[in-house]
Amino acid sequence: MDQDRSGAADAGNPDPGRGPAGSAEARNGAAAASSPAEWAGQLRLSVAERNGRSYAARQFHEGALRVLRPHYLDRSGQVTYTVVNPGGAYLGADAYLLDVAVERDASLVLTTQSATKVYRTPQGPATQDMTVRLGPGSCLEHVPDQLIVYRGGSYLQRTRVDMDPAASLLLAEVVTPGWSPSGESFAYDELRLRTEVRVTPPEVPAPAAPDRGAPAAEAQDRPADPCHVPGGPDRAASSGGTGAAPAGERARRLVVDQLRIRPDAHGGMSGVGFMEGFSHTGQLLVADARLDDELYERLCELVDASGTHSGITRAGTGEPYGVRCVCVRSLAHSTSAITALHRAVVDELRQRWRGQSPLRLRKY
């Protein structure tokens, strides 16, 4: 099981064409360039806030993905959406797209109706691409049911998050080995999960250009622009008149979290350095500017008391724009043990940051 949380490589090479949360460019997303015919299922959801209540401002689904009617778990105005796959499972070469935007001051809990199941994939790995954009003051708690990969299955999941420095992000995942006739715990071919989080501050327009009719003496009193190239274009004019850097140039990578499990390549998964006798693994990632030292110590206490084989670490490439990141990696003998730890962390953050009650999804 290979893990990489550093995300240091390519930190200065942001992807082009990525707009800030809430912009028309961002709403379309990078995946919009792909034809819908390429996806076995796709879901696009944009959540906005009005009068203290979050709601779906835009919603689109096609193929084997859709959402149930929204519901509100408490009086905070946070909306909960449940993703459904009517097909029941991911099969070989299936490709799924989720595109989620949580706009300014909106709050979303995103979950699934049941476990995500990946069966045999002889045609190639099943894939899921998820793109998330979080606006200023927004909140996303992504708490899906467990991921189960069965014998002969391969699964690749890529999650890309672009968040405002004032946004709050929580991503949870639990991986369970599927049943096999031989009784093997890890009979699938490969599992790869990659999560990347970038922080993009809002666009700040530059001061208005001076009146070109200003007296020459006044112009001479202005300090010289150290970045000005003689004979070159004015910076404000070259950036569309705003003087602000494009979103791609403002973005800073916070963290890349990777999990790769290839049972056959390692000759067994139960040894030291791999699953160490455990059957289930989980990861929880939190990104928020309010993750101070006192809260980190409290989260460490929750991890230590969980009864799982877990570790917690400060993750990321520094604190871009003041945003901090914490990652919890867990091993256990059951889904419920890891889920209980995740919920303990979720509930602690909900109460501290937003005064919300514990998360009770009311699925069953």
UniProtKB/Swiss-Prot annotation:
The gene coding this protein: ureD
Residue segments, region Disordered: 1-37, 201-250
Protein's name in the database: Urease accessory protein UreD
A GO CC term attached to the entry: cytoplasm
Major localisation: cytoplasm
General function of this protein: Required for maturation of urease via the functional incorporation of the urease nickel metallocenter.
Organism listed in the record: Kocuria rhizophila (strain ATCC 9341 / DSM 348 / NBRC 103217 / DC2201)
Family: Belongs to the UreD family.
Signal peptide start and end residues: none
Record field: compositional bias (Low complexity): 21-37, 209-218, 236-248
The protein's assembly and partners: UreD, UreF and UreG form a complex that acts as a GTP-hydrolysis-dependent molecular chaperone, activating the urease apoprotein by helping to assemble the nickel containing metallocenter of UreC. The UreE protein probably delivers the nickel.
Keyword list, A-Z: Chaperone, Cytoplasm, Nickel insertion
GO MF terms held by the record: nickel cation binding
InterPro entries registered for this protein in UniProt: UreD
